[in-house]
């Protein structure tokens, strides 16, 4: 997988190492994550709060990124274990995460006083798949930036159903460029999975989230 990423970077004249691989370990046991650690992996992505929390307790040296949809009632728990959150899609979630980090710090459940947060972008506005509509992205980014203990890190994008990845990632990259101008700094772009990472890297992805091609088919939940 890393060789495929490196080849794509070279093809599109991007520097080696400019894309990070985030293995997705949903449904995979802790033993599989330990194998990844042996190969130098320091961060993985998880979709479900309860599963991720249990794994984080067993593997305190691994960074766990929350990449699944978030319920506000789970924000306090996520704030205890998450090294980053890729799926913030409302001010309510952002503010709940900020409060959760403060509480976790007070209780000694967290060491880092800052939680990097990505906005999950909804290009088609379909609420059933999560994500923030284009019209609300800048407002939410400002909210994250203004929330104590949160750092606005960038955008996360999954192509909408029926969209080609080229179209989706091109539009998302344009949105990200506008945010970089707004904040006057570079931002991260969490985009691309096994089936569309070439298009994502072409359009500037800095983090690709890959599961099956690294660990094989997920065991049944």
UniProtKB/Swiss-Prot annotation:
Name this protein carries in UniProt: Pyridoxal phosphate homeostasis protein
GO molecular function annotations of the record: pyridoxal phosphate binding
InterPro entries: Ala_racemase_N, PLP-binding_barrel, PyrdxlP_homeostasis
Cystine pairs: none
Positions bearing N6-(pyridoxal phosphate)lysine: 26
Organism: Corynebacterium glutamicum (strain ATCC 13032 / DSM 20300 / JCM 1318 / BCRC 11384 / CCUG 27702 / LMG 3730 / NBRC 12168 / NCIMB 10025 / NRRL B-2784 / 534)
Highest taxon, organism lineage: Bacteria
Function of the molecule: Pyridoxal 5'-phosphate (PLP)-binding protein, which is involved in PLP homeostasis.
Pfam family, one: Ala_racemase_N
Protein family membership: Belongs to the pyridoxal phosphate-binding protein YggS/PROSC family.
Entry keyword annotation includes Kinase: no
Keyword RNA-binding in record: no
Keywords of this entry: Pyridoxal phosphate
């Amino acid at each position: 997988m890393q060789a495929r990423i490196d080849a794509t970077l070279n093809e599109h004249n991007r520097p080696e190492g400019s894309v990070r691989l985030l293995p997705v370990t949903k449904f995979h046991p802790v033993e599989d994550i330990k194998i990844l650690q042996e190969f130098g992996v320091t961060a993985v992505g998880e979709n479900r709060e309860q599963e991720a929390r249990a794994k984080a307790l067993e593997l305190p040296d691994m960074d766990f990124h929350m990449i699944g949809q978030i319920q506000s009632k789970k924000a306090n728990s996520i704030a205890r274990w998450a090294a980053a959150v890729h799926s913030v899609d409302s001010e309510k979630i952002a503010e709940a995460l900020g409060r959760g980090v403060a509480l976790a710090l007070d209780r000694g459940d967290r060491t880092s006083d800052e939680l990097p947060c990505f906005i999950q972008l909804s290009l088609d506005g379909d609420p059933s798949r999560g994500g923030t509509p284009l019209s609300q992205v800048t407002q939410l980014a400002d909210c994250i930036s203004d929330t104590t203990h949160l750092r606005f890190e960038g955008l996360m994008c999954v192509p909408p159903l029926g969209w080609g990845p080229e179209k989706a990632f091109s539009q998302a990259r344009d949105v990200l460029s506008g945010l970089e101008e707004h904040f006057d700094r570079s931002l991260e772009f969490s985009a691309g999975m096994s089936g569309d990472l070439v298009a994502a890297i072409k359009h500037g992805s800095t983090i690709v989230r890959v599961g099956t091609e690294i660990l094989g088919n997920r065991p049944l939940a």
